[in-house]
């Protein structure tokens, strides 16, 4: 799936939820921008792996207005499908070009954890 293709959260969710083990998929930033700009309700940004000083930069970068910041993983996240995490705790402002890795944890609950990789 290319970054220019329209984002279909249900299709992506259905594909990844078939796995019963940890799965990683790489997305480009434009792909993620497109998904977030469409206001997909299945997206959630969490601070679980975001350094405190990096969180404001990340939220501004994606222009996400409605987000949750749960303090822990399940059960708080058991109803979430997609979660964005910033995996680089030393990112400068603005964040340098990175790839996004989606990790599906379907043994606990059907949601996708998306992390930024440097």
From Swiss-Prot:
Q: List cellular component terms (GO).
A: mitochondrion
Q: To which species is this protein native?
A: Saccharomyces cerevisiae (strain ATCC 204508 / S288c) (Baker's yeast)
Entry keyword annotation includes Manganese: no
Q: Quick check: keyword Mitochondrion in the entry?
A: yes
Function of the molecule = Essential for the functional mitochondria and respiratory growth.
Q: What happens when the gene is disrupted?
A: Has a respiratory growth defect. Shows partial growth on nonfermentable carbon source.
One further remark on this entry is:
Although initially predicted to be a dubious gene because of an almost complete overlap with MRPL51, it shows transcript and protein level expression.
Q: State the compartments where it is located.
A: Mitochondrion
Task: Please provide the record's keywords in A-Z order.
Answer: Mitochondrion
Q: What is this protein called?
A: Mitochondrial protein YPR099C
């Amino acid at each position: 799936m290319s970054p220019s293709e329209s984002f279909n959260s249900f299709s992506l969710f259905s594909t990844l939820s078939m796995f019963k083990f940890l799965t990683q998929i790489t997305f480009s930033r434009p792909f993620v921008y497109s998904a977030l700009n469409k206001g997909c309700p299945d997206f959630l940004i969490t601070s679980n792996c975001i350094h405190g000083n990096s969180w404001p930069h990340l939220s501004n970068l994606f222009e996400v207005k409605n987000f949750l910041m749960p303090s822990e993983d399940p059960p708080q996240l058991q109803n979430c499908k997609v979660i964005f995490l910033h995996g680089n705790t030393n990112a400068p402002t603005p964040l340098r070009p990175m790839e996004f890795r989606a990790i599906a944890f379907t043994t606990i609950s059907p949601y996708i954890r998306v992390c930024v990789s440097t």
